[in-house]
Amino acid sequence: KKLDYIQSLGITAIWLNPVFESGWFDGGYDVIDFYKIDPRFGTNTDMVNLIKAAHQRGIKVCLDLVAGHTSTHCDWFKESANGDMNGRYADYYIWTDTISEKDKEEIALRHKDPNPQSSTRGRYVEIDAPRGKYYEKNFFECQPALNYGFAHPDPHHSWEEPVTAPGPQAVRREIRNIMSFWFDKGVDGFRVDMASSLVKNDPGKKETSKLWNEMRAWKDKYYPQCVLISEWSNPVEAIPAGFNIDFMIHFGIKGYASLFFAPNTPWGKSNANDGYGECYFDKAGKGTLKQFIDNFSDAYGKTKDLGYIAIPSANHDYQRPNIGTRNTMDQLKVTMMFFLTMPGVPFIYYGDEIGMKYQMNLPSKEGSNNRAGTRTPMQWMPGQTAGFSTCAPSQLYFPVATDNGRLTVSAQEKDKSSLLNYTRALIRLRHAAPALNNDGGWELISNVNQPYPMVYKRFSGGETYLIALNPSGRKVSVNIPHQGKGIVKLGTGKVSYKSGKAFDKIQLNGISSAIFSIK
Protein backbone atom coordinates (compact mmCIF):
# COMPACT_ATOMS: atom_id res chain seq x y z
CA LYS A 1 0.00 0.00 0.00
CA LYS A 2 2.92 2.37 0.58
CA LEU A 3 4.97 1.57 -2.53
CA ASP A 4 3.59 4.63 -4.33
CA TYR A 5 4.88 6.80 -1.49
CA ILE A 6 8.31 5.16 -1.69
CA GLN A 7 8.31 5.68 -5.44
CA SER A 8 7.38 9.35 -4.94
CA LEU A 9 10.60 9.84 -2.97
CA GLY A 10 12.68 8.68 -5.91
CA ILE A 11 13.78 5.55 -4.05
CA THR A 12 14.90 2.76 -6.40
CA ALA A 13 15.47 -0.06 -3.89
CA ILE A 14 14.33 -1.13 -0.44
CA TRP A 15 16.11 -3.29 2.13
CA LEU A 16 13.83 -5.14 4.52
CA ASN A 17 15.06 -6.12 7.97
CA PRO A 18 14.61 -9.84 8.77
CA VAL A 19 11.29 -11.22 7.57
CA PHE A 20 12.00 -14.96 7.79
CA GLU A 21 10.32 -17.09 10.46
CA SER A 22 11.99 -16.21 13.75
CA GLY A 23 11.98 -16.83 17.47
CA TRP A 24 11.89 -13.02 17.87
CA PHE A 25 14.34 -12.90 20.72
CA ASP A 26 16.58 -10.53 18.73
CA GLY A 27 14.31 -8.61 16.39
CA GLY A 28 14.24 -11.35 13.76
CA TYR A 29 17.98 -12.03 13.81
CA ASP A 30 17.33 -15.46 15.33
CA VAL A 31 15.99 -17.28 12.28
CA ILE A 32 13.97 -20.49 12.52
CA ASP A 33 13.31 -21.03 8.80
CA PHE A 34 15.18 -19.17 6.05
CA TYR A 35 12.75 -20.46 3.43
CA LYS A 36 9.57 -19.12 5.04
CA ILE A 37 8.22 -15.62 5.67
CA ASP A 38 7.28 -15.15 9.31
CA PRO A 39 3.49 -15.34 9.82
CA ARG A 40 3.50 -11.93 11.55
CA PHE A 41 4.27 -10.46 8.10
CA GLY A 42 2.36 -12.85 5.87
CA THR A 43 3.30 -15.67 3.52
CA ASN A 44 5.82 -16.43 0.81
CA THR A 45 3.11 -15.56 -1.69
CA ASP A 46 2.69 -12.16 -0.05
CA MET A 47 6.42 -11.57 -0.45
CA VAL A 48 6.32 -12.51 -4.13
CA ASN A 49 3.38 -10.15 -4.65
CA LEU A 50 5.28 -7.35 -2.90
CA ILE A 51 8.31 -7.93 -5.12
CA LYS A 52 6.17 -7.87 -8.27
CA ALA A 53 4.42 -4.66 -7.20
CA ALA A 54 7.76 -3.04 -6.35
CA HIS A 55 9.27 -4.04 -9.68
CA GLN A 56 6.30 -2.50 -11.50
CA ARG A 57 7.33 0.79 -9.91
CA GLY A 58 11.03 0.44 -10.67
CA ILE A 59 11.90 -0.50 -7.09
CA LYS A 60 14.21 -3.40 -6.28
CA VAL A 61 13.81 -5.47 -3.11
CA CYS A 62 16.68 -6.70 -0.93
CA LEU A 63 16.28 -8.99 2.06
CA ASP A 64 18.32 -9.42 5.23
CA LEU A 65 20.40 -12.61 5.35
CA VAL A 66 21.52 -13.65 8.83
CA ALA A 67 24.30 -15.90 7.60
CA GLY A 68 26.21 -16.43 10.83
CA HIS A 69 23.72 -18.21 13.06
CA THR A 70 20.19 -19.51 13.50
CA SER A 71 17.69 -19.74 16.32
CA THR A 72 17.88 -22.66 18.72
CA HIS A 73 14.32 -23.34 17.53
CA CYS A 74 15.59 -23.98 13.99
CA ASP A 75 15.10 -27.58 12.83
CA TRP A 76 18.75 -27.66 11.75
CA PHE A 77 19.84 -27.04 15.34
CA LYS A 78 17.34 -29.49 16.82
CA GLU A 79 18.52 -32.29 14.53
CA SER A 80 22.18 -31.44 15.12
CA ALA A 81 21.63 -31.46 18.90
CA ASN A 82 19.98 -34.89 18.77
CA GLY A 83 23.35 -36.44 18.02
CA ASP A 84 22.63 -38.35 14.80
CA MET A 85 26.07 -38.08 13.19
CA ASN A 86 24.62 -39.25 9.88
CA GLY A 87 21.98 -36.52 9.83
CA ARG A 88 22.10 -33.76 7.24
CA TYR A 89 22.64 -31.05 9.87
CA ALA A 90 24.98 -32.95 12.19
CA ASP A 91 27.92 -30.61 11.62
CA TYR A 92 26.06 -27.37 10.89
CA TYR A 93 27.05 -26.09 14.34
CA ILE A 94 30.11 -26.12 16.59
CA TRP A 95 29.82 -28.68 19.41
CA THR A 96 32.25 -29.73 22.12
CA ASP A 97 32.30 -31.63 25.41
CA THR A 98 35.29 -29.70 26.73
CA ILE A 99 36.00 -25.99 27.07
CA SER A 100 38.63 -24.00 28.93
CA GLU A 101 38.30 -22.92 32.54
CA LYS A 102 38.13 -19.33 31.33
CA ASP A 103 35.17 -20.16 29.09
CA LYS A 104 33.47 -21.90 32.02
CA GLU A 105 33.99 -18.77 34.11
CA GLU A 106 32.36 -16.68 31.37
CA ILE A 107 29.32 -18.97 31.42
CA ALA A 108 29.12 -18.67 35.21
CA LEU A 109 29.34 -14.88 35.05
CA ARG A 110 26.66 -14.76 32.35
CA HIS A 111 24.35 -16.84 34.52
CA LYS A 112 24.77 -14.35 37.36
CA ASP A 113 23.18 -11.73 35.12
CA PRO A 114 19.53 -11.02 36.08
CA ASN A 115 18.60 -12.01 32.53
CA PRO A 116 21.36 -14.30 31.24
CA GLN A 117 19.53 -15.07 28.00
CA SER A 118 19.87 -11.40 27.06
CA SER A 119 23.59 -11.29 27.80
CA THR A 120 26.12 -11.51 24.99
CA ARG A 121 28.91 -12.49 27.39
CA GLY A 122 31.09 -15.48 26.61
CA ARG A 123 31.57 -17.82 23.69
CA TYR A 124 29.80 -21.04 24.67
CA VAL A 125 26.42 -22.19 25.95
CA GLU A 126 26.07 -25.19 28.25
CA ILE A 127 23.36 -27.62 27.16
CA ASP A 128 22.20 -31.13 27.98
CA ALA A 129 22.16 -32.57 24.45
CA PRO A 130 23.29 -35.90 22.96
CA ARG A 131 25.51 -34.04 20.48
CA GLY A 132 27.60 -32.30 23.11
CA LYS A 133 27.73 -30.41 26.38
CA TYR A 134 28.44 -27.05 24.79
CA TYR A 135 27.72 -25.20 21.56
CA GLU A 136 29.32 -22.01 20.32
CA LYS A 137 27.07 -18.98 20.09
CA ASN A 138 27.45 -15.71 18.23
CA PHE A 139 25.57 -13.20 20.39
CA PHE A 140 22.69 -14.35 22.60
CA GLU A 141 22.36 -17.92 23.89
CA CYS A 142 19.53 -18.52 21.42
CA GLN A 143 21.83 -17.79 18.44
CA PRO A 144 24.09 -20.83 17.87
CA ALA A 145 26.89 -20.09 15.42
CA LEU A 146 26.78 -21.88 12.10
CA ASN A 147 29.91 -23.89 11.39
CA TYR A 148 31.92 -22.26 8.60
CA GLY A 149 35.07 -23.79 10.01
CA PHE A 150 38.20 -22.30 11.56
CA ALA A 151 40.90 -20.57 9.56
CA HIS A 152 43.49 -21.88 12.02
CA PRO A 153 42.06 -24.87 13.93
CA ASP A 154 43.70 -25.53 17.27
CA PRO A 155 45.19 -29.05 17.03
CA HIS A 156 44.20 -29.58 20.68
CA HIS A 157 40.54 -28.77 19.92
CA SER A 158 39.09 -31.63 17.91
CA TRP A 159 35.83 -29.74 17.37
CA GLU A 160 37.55 -26.94 15.45
CA GLU A 161 37.20 -28.06 11.84
CA PRO A 162 39.05 -26.55 8.88
CA VAL A 163 37.00 -24.60 6.35
CA THR A 164 37.37 -27.48 3.88
CA ALA A 165 35.68 -30.03 6.18
CA PRO A 166 32.33 -31.51 5.08
CA GLY A 167 30.32 -29.60 7.71
CA PRO A 168 31.55 -26.11 6.80
CA GLN A 169 31.21 -26.90 3.10
CA ALA A 170 27.62 -28.08 3.65
CA VAL A 171 26.78 -24.82 5.41
CA ARG A 172 28.13 -22.85 2.44
CA ARG A 173 25.92 -24.85 0.10
CA GLU A 174 22.93 -24.17 2.34
CA ILE A 175 23.53 -20.42 2.20
CA ARG A 176 23.70 -20.59 -1.60
CA ASN A 177 20.47 -22.58 -1.59
CA ILE A 178 18.78 -19.91 0.52
CA MET A 179 19.91 -17.11 -1.77
CA SER A 180 18.94 -19.09 -4.87
CA PHE A 181 15.49 -19.85 -3.43
CA TRP A 182 14.72 -16.15 -2.98
CA PHE A 183 16.53 -14.91 -6.10
CA ASP A 184 14.29 -17.26 -8.08
CA LYS A 185 11.27 -15.57 -6.47
CA GLY A 186 12.44 -12.16 -7.65
CA VAL A 187 14.54 -10.88 -4.75
CA ASP A 188 17.20 -8.49 -6.06
CA GLY A 189 19.85 -8.85 -3.38
CA PHE A 190 20.79 -9.53 0.21
CA ARG A 191 22.23 -7.42 2.98
CA VAL A 192 24.38 -9.91 4.89
CA ASP A 193 24.37 -9.51 8.65
CA MET A 194 27.82 -9.49 10.30
CA ALA A 195 29.36 -10.71 7.06
CA SER A 196 32.95 -10.57 8.32
CA SER A 197 32.46 -12.94 11.24
CA LEU A 198 31.58 -16.29 9.63
CA VAL A 199 34.89 -18.18 9.72
CA LYS A 200 36.25 -18.47 13.26
CA ASN A 201 39.82 -17.64 14.29
CA ASP A 202 40.37 -15.76 11.04
CA PRO A 203 42.72 -12.83 11.68
CA GLY A 204 42.87 -10.62 8.63
CA LYS A 205 39.62 -12.23 7.40
CA LYS A 206 41.51 -14.19 4.74
CA GLU A 207 39.27 -17.28 4.79
CA THR A 208 36.09 -15.24 5.23
CA SER A 209 37.09 -13.21 2.18
CA LYS A 210 37.69 -16.40 0.20
CA LEU A 211 34.24 -17.63 1.20
CA TRP A 212 32.51 -14.48 -0.02
CA ASN A 213 34.52 -14.35 -3.23
CA GLU A 214 33.25 -17.86 -3.94
CA MET A 215 29.70 -16.69 -3.23
CA ARG A 216 30.19 -13.67 -5.50
CA ALA A 217 31.50 -15.82 -8.36
CA TRP A 218 28.49 -18.11 -7.98
CA LYS A 219 26.08 -15.16 -7.86
CA ASP A 220 27.64 -13.46 -10.88
CA LYS A 221 27.36 -16.69 -12.87
CA TYR A 222 23.74 -17.49 -12.08
CA TYR A 223 22.24 -14.20 -10.85
CA PRO A 224 24.40 -11.40 -12.29
CA GLN A 225 21.64 -8.83 -11.87
CA CYS A 226 21.53 -9.28 -8.08
CA VAL A 227 23.65 -7.57 -5.43
CA LEU A 228 25.41 -8.50 -2.20
CA ILE A 229 25.54 -5.85 0.53
CA SER A 230 27.69 -6.45 3.59
CA GLU A 231 27.49 -5.41 7.19
CA TRP A 232 31.27 -5.51 7.43
CA SER A 233 31.97 -1.82 8.00
CA ASN A 234 35.36 -1.98 6.40
CA PRO A 235 34.96 -1.40 2.65
CA VAL A 236 38.67 -1.94 2.04
CA GLU A 237 38.16 -5.57 3.15
CA ALA A 238 34.53 -6.17 2.18
CA ILE A 239 34.53 -4.99 -1.43
CA PRO A 240 37.62 -7.00 -2.51
CA ALA A 241 35.98 -9.92 -0.66
CA GLY A 242 33.17 -9.86 -3.22
CA PHE A 243 30.53 -7.47 -1.94
CA ASN A 244 28.99 -4.84 -4.18
CA ILE A 245 28.31 -2.46 -1.29
CA ASP A 246 29.63 -2.08 2.25
CA PHE A 247 28.58 0.31 5.00
CA MET A 248 30.45 2.94 6.94
CA ILE A 249 28.47 2.91 10.18
CA HIS A 250 28.73 2.84 13.98
CA PHE A 251 31.43 0.16 14.22
CA GLY A 252 34.36 -0.96 12.08
CA ILE A 253 36.38 1.82 10.49
CA LYS A 254 36.00 4.95 12.56
CA GLY A 255 34.42 8.19 11.41
CA TYR A 256 30.65 7.84 11.39
CA ALA A 257 30.38 8.32 15.15
CA SER A 258 32.50 11.47 15.02
CA LEU A 259 29.94 12.98 12.65
CA PHE A 260 26.70 12.13 14.45
CA PHE A 261 27.06 10.64 17.95
CA ALA A 262 27.02 13.37 20.60
CA PRO A 263 28.82 12.43 23.84
CA ASN A 264 25.62 12.62 25.92
CA THR A 265 23.72 10.07 23.80
CA PRO A 266 23.84 6.28 24.24
CA TRP A 267 25.96 5.88 21.11
CA GLY A 268 28.27 8.74 21.98
CA LYS A 269 28.95 7.02 25.29
CA SER A 270 29.53 3.65 23.65
CA ASN A 271 31.99 5.24 21.21
CA ALA A 272 33.78 7.30 23.85
CA ASN A 273 37.08 5.60 23.02
CA ASP A 274 36.94 6.73 19.38
CA GLY A 275 38.75 9.90 20.39
CA TYR A 276 36.66 12.52 18.64
CA GLY A 277 35.16 14.56 21.51
CA GLU A 278 32.13 16.48 20.19
CA CYS A 279 30.31 15.31 17.06
CA TYR A 280 30.54 17.33 13.85
CA PHE A 281 26.83 17.66 13.01
CA ASP A 282 26.01 19.63 16.14
CA LYS A 283 25.05 23.29 16.40
CA ALA A 284 27.75 23.84 19.03
CA GLY A 285 30.25 23.62 16.18
CA LYS A 286 32.97 21.92 18.24
CA GLY A 287 33.38 18.81 16.13
CA THR A 288 36.18 17.57 13.95
CA LEU A 289 36.30 16.13 10.43
CA LYS A 290 39.74 14.55 10.49
CA GLN A 291 38.79 11.05 11.64
CA PHE A 292 35.97 10.74 9.12
CA ILE A 293 37.82 12.33 6.20
CA ASP A 294 41.01 10.32 6.75
CA ASN A 295 39.18 6.99 6.88
CA PHE A 296 36.57 7.71 4.23
CA SER A 297 39.17 9.08 1.80
CA ASP A 298 41.33 6.00 2.26
CA ALA A 299 38.41 3.60 1.73
CA TYR A 300 37.03 5.60 -1.20
CA GLY A 301 40.37 5.69 -2.97
CA LYS A 302 40.97 1.95 -2.53
CA THR A 303 37.49 0.79 -3.58
CA LYS A 304 36.47 3.26 -6.30
CA ASP A 305 35.32 1.44 -9.45
CA LEU A 306 35.26 -1.87 -7.52
CA GLY A 307 32.16 -1.32 -5.39
CA TYR A 308 30.33 1.28 -3.34
CA ILE A 309 30.52 2.70 0.17
CA ALA A 310 27.16 3.40 1.81
CA ILE A 311 26.78 5.98 4.59
CA PRO A 312 23.22 5.43 5.88
CA SER A 313 21.15 8.08 7.62
CA ALA A 314 20.55 5.47 10.35
CA ASN A 315 19.56 1.85 10.70
CA HIS A 316 17.83 -0.48 13.16
CA ASP A 317 20.98 -0.74 15.30
CA TYR A 318 21.67 2.88 16.23
CA GLN A 319 20.21 6.35 16.65
CA ARG A 320 18.46 8.52 14.08
CA PRO A 321 19.78 11.96 13.04
CA ASN A 322 16.99 13.57 15.10
CA ILE A 323 18.29 13.08 18.62
CA GLY A 324 19.05 15.41 21.51
CA THR A 325 19.72 18.99 20.41
CA ARG A 326 19.86 18.07 16.71
CA ASN A 327 16.11 18.34 16.27
CA THR A 328 15.12 21.25 14.00
CA MET A 329 14.15 20.93 10.35
CA ASP A 330 17.08 23.11 9.26
CA GLN A 331 19.56 20.95 11.16
CA LEU A 332 18.08 17.80 9.64
CA LYS A 333 18.17 19.34 6.16
CA VAL A 334 21.91 19.92 6.52
CA THR A 335 22.46 16.30 7.53
CA MET A 336 20.21 15.02 4.73
CA MET A 337 22.19 17.03 2.18
CA PHE A 338 25.31 15.24 3.38
CA PHE A 339 23.74 11.78 3.08
CA LEU A 340 22.39 12.48 -0.41
CA THR A 341 25.42 14.19 -1.96
CA MET A 342 28.21 11.82 -0.99
CA PRO A 343 29.42 9.20 -3.50
CA GLY A 344 28.37 5.58 -3.20
CA VAL A 345 24.86 4.31 -2.51
CA PRO A 346 22.76 6.40 -0.10
CA PHE A 347 20.53 4.51 2.35
CA ILE A 348 17.68 6.43 4.00
CA TYR A 349 16.27 4.71 7.09
CA TYR A 350 12.47 4.78 7.11
CA GLY A 351 11.11 7.98 8.61
CA ASP A 352 14.35 9.94 8.42
CA GLU A 353 12.91 11.70 5.37
CA ILE A 354 10.36 13.32 7.71
CA GLY A 355 12.76 13.74 10.62
CA MET A 356 11.41 11.05 12.93
CA LYS A 357 13.17 11.31 16.25
CA TYR A 358 15.01 8.71 18.27
CA GLN A 359 12.76 8.08 21.26
CA MET A 360 14.79 7.93 24.45
CA ASN A 361 14.24 5.48 27.32
CA LEU A 362 11.86 3.01 25.71
CA PRO A 363 11.65 -0.44 27.31
CA SER A 364 13.48 -3.21 25.51
CA LYS A 365 11.44 -5.56 23.37
CA GLU A 366 12.60 -8.63 21.49
CA GLY A 367 16.25 -7.85 22.17
CA SER A 368 16.11 -4.20 21.15
CA ASN A 369 17.75 -2.77 24.30
CA ASN A 370 18.71 0.87 23.59
CA ARG A 371 17.93 0.34 19.91
CA ALA A 372 14.21 0.47 20.71
CA GLY A 373 14.03 4.22 20.15
CA THR A 374 14.98 3.87 16.51
CA ARG A 375 12.40 1.13 15.77
CA THR A 376 9.18 3.04 16.46
CA PRO A 377 6.24 2.96 14.01
CA MET A 378 6.37 4.96 10.79
CA GLN A 379 4.45 8.20 11.23
CA TRP A 380 1.96 8.65 8.41
CA MET A 381 -0.52 11.04 10.02
CA PRO A 382 -1.33 12.65 13.39
CA GLY A 383 -2.91 10.44 16.00
CA GLN A 384 -2.03 7.93 18.67
CA THR A 385 -1.07 5.26 16.14
CA ALA A 386 0.12 7.71 13.46
CA GLY A 387 -1.76 5.86 10.74
CA PHE A 388 0.56 2.89 11.15
CA SER A 389 -2.20 0.67 12.48
CA THR A 390 -5.89 0.67 13.39
CA CYS A 391 -5.13 -1.16 16.64
CA ALA A 392 -5.38 0.34 20.10
CA PRO A 393 -2.26 2.40 20.93
CA SER A 394 -1.36 -0.04 23.71
CA GLN A 395 -1.05 -2.83 21.13
CA LEU A 396 1.62 -1.09 19.05
CA TYR A 397 5.06 -2.71 18.96
CA PHE A 398 6.51 0.55 20.32
CA PRO A 399 4.71 3.82 21.05
CA VAL A 400 4.62 6.55 18.43
CA ALA A 401 6.62 9.77 18.84
CA THR A 402 4.72 12.13 16.54
CA ASP A 403 5.87 15.40 18.09
CA ASN A 404 2.24 16.62 18.10
CA GLY A 405 1.66 15.46 14.55
CA ARG A 406 4.36 17.66 12.98
CA LEU A 407 6.68 14.81 12.03
CA THR A 408 4.22 12.96 9.82
CA VAL A 409 3.96 12.36 6.11
CA SER A 410 0.51 13.96 5.84
CA ALA A 411 1.65 17.17 7.53
CA GLN A 412 4.82 17.47 5.47
CA GLU A 413 3.21 16.62 2.13
CA LYS A 414 1.31 19.93 2.40
CA ASP A 415 4.39 21.98 3.29
CA LYS A 416 6.63 22.85 0.33
CA SER A 417 9.49 23.68 2.71
CA SER A 418 9.25 20.43 4.69
CA LEU A 419 12.09 17.99 5.16
CA LEU A 420 10.09 15.44 3.17
CA ASN A 421 9.86 17.64 0.09
CA TYR A 422 13.46 18.78 0.56
CA THR A 423 14.55 15.12 0.57
CA ARG A 424 12.60 14.55 -2.64
CA ALA A 425 14.32 17.54 -4.24
CA LEU A 426 17.75 16.25 -3.21
CA ILE A 427 17.03 12.82 -4.67
CA ARG A 428 15.70 14.33 -7.92
CA LEU A 429 18.86 16.38 -8.31
CA ARG A 430 21.05 13.37 -7.52
CA HIS A 431 19.29 11.34 -10.22
CA ALA A 432 19.46 14.18 -12.75
CA ALA A 433 23.13 15.12 -12.29
CA PRO A 434 25.74 12.44 -13.14
CA ALA A 435 28.29 14.29 -10.99
CA LEU A 436 26.08 13.78 -7.92
CA ASN A 437 25.17 10.15 -8.44
CA ASN A 438 26.82 7.01 -7.09
CA ASP A 439 29.76 7.05 -9.51
CA GLY A 440 30.55 10.75 -9.65
CA GLY A 441 33.99 11.79 -8.44
CA TRP A 442 34.55 13.21 -4.96
CA GLU A 443 37.22 15.47 -3.47
CA LEU A 444 37.40 17.45 -0.24
CA ILE A 445 38.05 21.11 -1.11
CA SER A 446 38.04 22.74 2.32
CA ASN A 447 40.77 22.34 4.94
CA VAL A 448 40.15 19.38 7.24
CA ASN A 449 41.74 21.38 10.06
CA GLN A 450 39.12 24.13 9.59
CA PRO A 451 36.10 21.85 9.87
CA TYR A 452 33.34 24.43 9.46
CA PRO A 453 32.21 24.58 6.73
CA MET A 454 32.86 21.25 5.04
CA VAL A 455 33.17 21.76 1.29
CA TYR A 456 33.59 18.94 -1.21
CA LYS A 457 33.48 18.62 -4.96
CA ARG A 458 31.42 16.16 -7.00
CA PHE A 459 32.29 15.87 -10.67
CA SER A 460 31.70 13.83 -13.81
CA GLY A 461 32.82 14.72 -17.31
CA GLY A 462 32.46 18.48 -17.62
CA GLU A 463 29.91 18.75 -14.80
CA THR A 464 30.98 20.01 -11.36
CA TYR A 465 29.13 20.73 -8.13
CA LEU A 466 30.39 21.99 -4.79
CA ILE A 467 28.58 21.02 -1.61
CA ALA A 468 29.03 23.30 1.40
CA LEU A 469 27.76 22.24 4.83
CA ASN A 470 27.65 24.28 8.02
CA PRO A 471 25.86 22.39 10.80
CA SER A 472 27.21 24.82 13.42
CA GLY A 473 25.06 27.63 14.80
CA ARG A 474 27.48 30.40 13.78
CA LYS A 475 28.23 32.16 10.51
CA VAL A 476 31.32 30.75 8.79
CA SER A 477 33.26 31.35 5.60
CA VAL A 478 36.08 29.70 3.70
CA ASN A 479 38.37 30.60 0.83
CA ILE A 480 38.92 27.81 -1.68
CA PRO A 481 41.01 27.59 -4.86
CA HIS A 482 39.14 29.19 -7.76
CA GLN A 483 36.52 26.85 -9.20
CA GLY A 484 34.35 29.14 -11.31
CA LYS A 485 31.00 30.80 -10.83
CA GLY A 486 28.88 29.12 -8.16
CA ILE A 487 25.10 29.00 -8.65
CA VAL A 488 22.89 27.66 -5.86
CA LYS A 489 20.91 24.64 -7.05
CA LEU A 490 19.48 23.69 -3.68
CA GLY A 491 20.09 24.73 -0.11
CA THR A 492 18.85 25.77 3.28
CA GLY A 493 19.66 28.97 5.17
CA LYS A 494 21.51 32.01 3.84
CA VAL A 495 24.58 31.25 1.70
CA SER A 496 26.75 33.11 -0.78
CA TYR A 497 29.47 32.27 -3.31
CA LYS A 498 31.87 34.98 -4.49
CA SER A 499 34.17 34.02 -7.33
CA GLY A 500 37.64 35.57 -7.52
CA LYS A 501 40.70 35.17 -9.73
CA ALA A 502 42.75 32.93 -7.47
CA PHE A 503 40.24 32.10 -4.74
CA ASP A 504 36.51 31.79 -4.31
CA LYS A 505 34.78 32.66 -1.03
CA ILE A 506 31.86 30.67 0.34
CA GLN A 507 29.91 32.09 3.27
CA LEU A 508 27.14 30.34 5.17
CA ASN A 509 24.97 31.48 8.04
CA GLY A 510 24.54 29.15 10.98
CA ILE A 511 22.89 25.81 10.19
CA SER A 512 23.05 26.29 6.43
CA SER A 513 24.06 24.27 3.42
CA ALA A 514 24.07 24.51 -0.35
CA ILE A 515 24.75 22.67 -3.56
CA PHE A 516 26.52 25.00 -5.99
CA SER A 517 26.63 24.29 -9.69
CA ILE A 518 30.02 25.47 -10.96
CA LYS A 519 30.02 27.23 -14.33
Residue map of PLM features:
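Acidic/aromatic-lined carbohydrate-recognition and catalytic surfaces
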Residues: 1-170, 184, 195-243, 378
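Short loop/turn motifs at secondary-structure junctions
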Residues: 10, 30, 186-188, 312, ...
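Active-site-proximal helices and loops of the catalytic beta/alpha 8
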Residues: 51-55, 68-69, 77-87, 91, ...
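Generic enzyme active-site microenvironment
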Residues: 62-63, 191, 229, 312-313, ...
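Loop/helix patches that line or flank the sugar-binding groove of alpha-linked glycan CAZymes
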Residues: 220-222, 242, 270, 291, ...
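Beta-strand-rich binding/interaction modules
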Residues: 475-495
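C-terminal beta-strand-rich structural cap/linker in extracellular carbohydrate-active enzymes
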Residues: 498-519
